[in-house]
Amino acid sequence: MDRTRRLRQTAVMRSMVRENHVRTEELIYPLFVMEGENIVQPVESMPGICQYSVDRMNEELDRVKALQIPAILIFGIPEHKDEVGSGAYDEHGIVQTAIRRIKKDYPDLLVIADVCLCEYTSHGHCGLIRDGIILNDETLPLLAQTAVSYARAGADIIAPSDMMDKRVGAIRQALDAAGFTYTCLLYTSPSPRDRSV
């Protein structure tokens, strides 16, 4: 026998099991920025989503603001990749450059910055590799350095999506030590679609 009345006993219980209402002010828009100029490149795995060069991203951000979406999650696509993902923590990297521009042109937009090395490494993994083994502990300082550089550029929230153990603690400690005690951390689940960009 189906007894749904069990789920209607209290206001809290009803609130927890009722239908969801998605509103634009609760959405976060993904923004993929790439190096280069005058680029708007569709992402095949995500219809309606494009990669933008910094000089063209405001076209999309104007649409985001018009829709009253209050936040973006920014992903970088660098031209240069190397074994240690140095583009991720380069103070003049693509994400850092884009964040500074966004905060200048759209100061009220909440900027969430994805932290992972996979897009910046020549091997495509989110950690350093030696002899075919991912070096977890050696990767943590690079992730922390990336997070601090994003915060320094103006990111409101740091969103680690890598798969290194103890990354959140390492990032939090580095942010605090650099004076970014009020910069928040938000977990983002790695998505095969994000990784296909």
Q: Where on the chain are the PLM-derived regions?
A:
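Hydrophobic faces of well-ordered beta-strands that scaffold small-molecule active sites
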Residues: 27-30, 72, 111-113, 158, ...
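Active-site mouth loops of central-metabolism enzymes
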Residues: 41-55, 127-141
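Catalytic beta/alpha-barrel core
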Residues: 139, 156-163
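N-terminal amphipathic alpha-helix/helix-capping segment at the start of soluble metabolic enzymes
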Residues: 1-32, 39
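Alpha-helix-loop-beta-strand connector modules within alpha/beta enzyme cores
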Residues: 86-113, 168-186
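Conserved small/polar residues in nucleotide/adenosyl-binding loops
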Residues: 187-194
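Conserved, mostly hydrophobic/aromatic
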Residues: 31, 57, 114, 150, ...
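Glycine-rich, proline-tolerant flexible connector loops at the mouths of alpha/beta enzymes
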Residues: 41-49, 71-92, 161, 165-168
